[in-house]
């Protein structure tokens, strides 16, 4: 039923990430090594925000210890990786809500365990529920 929608969403997200990656490659050369690794982790998280990422796995990909990655990530982004990922998921969810997706579908596509989990994070971050947000946007 939603297969075509999911595929088109996946392809548009992939195209967006590829364009960002090409732009960021030029900028990355000028960054310190630790910051380049943090940017790479951000790109990995952004490429699959619906997935549950493990800190040890991300650290291994960029050649850092989990503890060092955690410190460096927070230093350069202001948030630990999980909090950054939740914020990224919420930004993605706003886009999907504006496109007319149902709240339960948005929760699933953005990697929240269920609609209630999504609503809690949404309200904590934005001060209203997704339904209230949609009611005020219309």
Task: State the predicted function of each range.
Residues 1-7, 11-62, 75-83, 87:
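Short, Lys/Arg-enriched, Trp-marked, Pro/Gly-tolerant hinge/linker segments that flank
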Residues 4, 65, 112-114:
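Intrinsic low-complexity/disordered segments
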Residues 5-8, 117, 121:
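Short, charged alpha-helical segments
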Residues 42-47, 52-56, 75-115, 119, ...:
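Terminal helix-turn-helix DNA-binding modules in bacterial transcription factors
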């Amino acid at each position: 039923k939603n297969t075509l929608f999911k595929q088109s969403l996946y392809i548009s997200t992939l195209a967006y990430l590829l364009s960002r990656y090409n732009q960021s490659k030029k900028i990355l050369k000028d960054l310190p090594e630790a910051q380049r690794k943090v940017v790479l982790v951000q790109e990995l998280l952004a490429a699959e925000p619906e997935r549950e990422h493990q800190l040890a796995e991300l650290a291994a990909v960029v050649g850092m210890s989990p503890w060092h990655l955690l410190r460096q990530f927070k230093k350069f982004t202001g948030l630990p990786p999980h909090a950054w990922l939740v914020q990224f998921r919420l930004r993605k969810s706003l886009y999907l809500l504006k496109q007319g997706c149902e709240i339960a579908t948005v929760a699933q596509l953005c990697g929240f365990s269920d609609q209630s989990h999504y609503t809690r994070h949404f309200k904590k971050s934005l001060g209203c529920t997704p339904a209230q947000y949609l009611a005020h946007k219309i």
